[in-house]
Amino acid sequence: MKLSRIALATMLVAAPLAAANAGVTVTPLLLGYTFQDSQHNNGGKDGNLTNGPELQDDLFVGAALGIELTPWLGFEAEYNQVKGDVDGASAGAEYKQKQINGNFYVTSDLITKNYDSKIKPYVLLGAGHYKYDFDGVNRGTRGTSEEGTLGNAGVGAFWRLNDALSLRTEARATYNADEEFWNYTALAGLNVVLGGHLKPAAPVVEVAPVEPTPVTPQPQELTEDLNMELRVFFDTNKSNIKDQYKPEIAKVAEKLSEYPNATARIEGHTDNTGPRKLNERLSLARANSVKSALVNEYNVDASRLSTQGFAWDQPIADNKTKEGRAMNRRVFATITGSRTVVVQPGQEAAAPAAAQ
């Protein structure tokens, strides 16, 4: 039962390593020959395993799963068994020896640093758990099985066939700590590496900084929007433009020249004095006065200007007061448009025209 628990624990540890598939080693079959300790098993030592009869040397069979911890250090979980005869006991007497081992090995790469060499000698140290089962052997009160702790020490070599396959040979000594004797095993197997052997990280090479190629700034095309307003106020029953508003009309003409696709919507308004028909004509006349000034004095294309009269329908002040009526006798124009300008490197784009 104890051996089974150790085997299960070993498998649980090894499974994630195999799943990682990087530097994982598998030895699916280890074959060898185990030489049993003759002094311990020939009846010459009190309390030996067989109580007299001698365990015979026999075939060693095993398998191992491991991982390369560094390019020169590895760990393996191993299971093996030996089944042989027992001389001096009843006819057909035999024993079966089982082991679960955890072994570390250090290759010659620790010293040589020759990670691509085809032959890699190694030394091995480890420990494990053993169990002997006996059939046809009279062991008195000791029963038909024996188990305990062991230690392993060995030397060997990996003979690389390619980066994934190596032949493996090893000579190993196993010490039975409970019974105080040594067994010796010569073994060989085929070692498979999943994901390739570990190698030291490549040295960091400092790369000289690359000076960026100077970038010559290029001219940029930008769109400038025009949003402008014009307000002109009139005397009662008049549609002529007072001199004080002519500079404002000139500014509108200038912007219409700067923005060739700009248009103006010109709206005329009146107070509520007089009949409606008269105020409708008067409000339109006031809008047309501003349009005529732009067309006749500044050569603005008439198709870019639209006019409309609203009479007293859209007052902005109280028509009951003199001041309010003066505010309502007006023209209100909105000028909108856009243009594409080319801005040279280092030149700031002009701010959009603000509403006036």
Curated annotation (Swiss-Prot):
Give the disulfide map. none
Question: What's in the GO CC field?
Answer: cell outer membrane; pore complex
- Does GTP-binding appear among the keywords? no
Query: What is one GO biological process annotated to this record?
Result: monoatomic ion transport
Q: Which GO terms describe its molecular function?
A: porin activity
Indicate where this protein is primarily found.
membrane
OmpA-like domain boundaries = 221-339
InterPro entries in UniProt: Bact_OuterMem_StrucFunc (IPR050330), OMP/PagP_b-brl (IPR011250), Omp38 (IPR054882), OMP_b-brl (IPR027385), OMP_bac (IPR006664), OmpA-like (IPR006665), OmpA-like_sf (IPR036737)
Location of this chain's protein in the cell: Cell outer membrane
Leader sequence range is 1-19
Question: Membrane topology for this entry?
Answer: Multi-pass membrane protein
Q: Which domain of life is it from?
A: Bacteria
* Annotated CDD domains: OmpA_C-like
Instruction: Show the Gene3D superfamilies listed in the entry.
Output: 2.40.160.20, OmpA-like domain
User: What keyword terms does UniProt attach to this protein?
Assistant: Apoptosis, Cell outer membrane, Ion transport, Membrane, Porin, Signal, Transmembrane, Transmembrane beta strand, Transport
Role: Porin. Induces apoptosis in human cells through caspases-dependent and AIF-dependent pathways. Purified Omp38 enters the cells and localizes to the mitochondria, which leads to a release of proapoptotic molecules such as cytochrome c and AIF (apoptosis-inducing factor).
On assembly, the entry states: Homotrimer.
Q: Which family does it belong to?
A: Belongs to the outer membrane OOP (TC 1.B.6) superfamily.
- Please identify the protein, giving its name as recorded: Outer membrane protein Omp38
**Which lineage do the record's taxonomy fields give for this organism?**
Bacteria, Pseudomonadati, Pseudomonadota, Gammaproteobacteria, Moraxellales
